[in-house]
Amino acid sequence: MSRAYVVSQKETLTETKNIKDGLETKIDILPILPPEIMGELLLDSLVEKGYKKDPCGTSVTKEIDGVLIVVDGGGTVTAEIQEEVTVNTTITATGRSDEDYKDHHERAMSQINQKLEEQREQAKKIINDKIDEKRADITKTLEKVLATEKKNIDEAINDTTIKALKQKAAQLGEIISIEESGQDVTIRVKV
């Protein structure tokens, strides 16, 4: 009399990746005053826009939706997002033997190992696809935050230019009048 034996094996595959995306760019500021003063004015303008000054006072930072934006006094803007992603998937394989278990155990285990290897390859593709999806999501978040924050940085540059022009005018002579209309500024100086 023969019996059928069923052997199952289950594995969980886990992969953890640290995904980063970012960029660095340089902003141009008119050199109305010496670079260190222009840098201080820029950082002060960014603080008014919600940035936080670092303890050394050489840069400002702001974090939005996991994106860290750093602007230094030299006008270098760095934006970076970093996230750790863990993907799990479980695979199961079953092998059977219709003969005496002792004699055909190796054949059943061979079937299981072959099935598991095939499923591992499929699972790795699924894991890589999920990680690629997450990488695309992170990039979209970075682009969205930068598009929004560009307006604040542009406004800070304009504010910096206006403050620098006022200081330069005061150095040249007596300021008679200052008229501001939005981003337009008219300064009258008596030399």
PLM-predicted stretches and their roles:
Residues 1-191:
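Interaction-mediating elements
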